Amino acid sequence: MAATVKQHVQLALSLPPRLRTFLARYPPASILPAGADPETHKTPYQEESPNPFMPTKHPITGKWHNPKYSLRRQAELVKLAQEHGVEELLPFTRKLNEEKLRKRVELGLRVKGTGVGEKVKGHKHERTLVAKMEKRREAMLAMPDLIREWKKVGKRNWTKFPK
């Protein structure tokens, strides 16, 4: 028993200070002391906001408060936790690998703007290029007939200049 506690302490001390501080402020239920109820055994930080990665609604004013950790800081913490193999100890966040994989499976490899009836914006010259080149190709294919007709009618009587 004492050996496992020593190992856990040694593992905790091997974590980087930022991750260690975070886990001390917001300990997950899995590392609480034996017999402690997660609902009653809370740190002052957890009482203020149970999940520091999610926005909270003020109980009196009803106003929403930003998360304690910004998305950038969340991503940094998740990366640190992944490097040290303690990612499952973090509270829920959109930056967790499981959440990213779930979203990727749910939405697929979609690109915004390529749905049914949607076009990828692009520049106007890029969007009209295909139609313009097709029109040019048709004009080039019709060119021998146009030249023959021009030679027959002559310069003076020619009225069908291509627009």
From Swiss-Prot:
Transmembrane segments: none annotated. It comes from the Eukaryota. Its main location: mitochondrion. It is found in: Mitochondrion. The keyword Iron does not apply. Residues 33-53 are annotated as: Disordered. GO terms for molecular function: structural constituent of ribosome. InterPro entries: Ribosomal_mL59, Ribosomal_mL59_dom. Keywords: Mitochondrion, Ribonucleoprotein, Ribosomal protein. One of its GO terms (cellular component) is mitochondrial large ribosomal subunit. Component of the mitochondrial ribosome (mitoribosome), a dedicated translation machinery responsible for the synthesis of mitochondrial genome-encoded proteins, including at least some of the essential transmembrane subunits of the mitochondrial respiratory chain. The mitoribosomes are attached to the mitochondrial inner membrane and translation products are cotranslationally integrated into the membrane. Component of the mitochondrial large ribosomal subunit (mt-LSU). Mature N.crassa 74S mitochondrial ribosomes consist of a small (37S) and a large (54S) subunit. The 37S small subunit contains a 16S ribosomal RNA (16S mt-rRNA) and 32 different proteins. The 54S large subunit contains a 23S rRNA (23S mt-rRNA) and 42 different proteins. Belongs to the mitochondrion-specific ribosomal protein mL59 family. This is Large ribosomal subunit protein mL59. It comes from Neurospora crassa (strain ATCC 24698 / 74-OR23-1A / CBS 708.71 / DSM 1257 / FGSC 987).
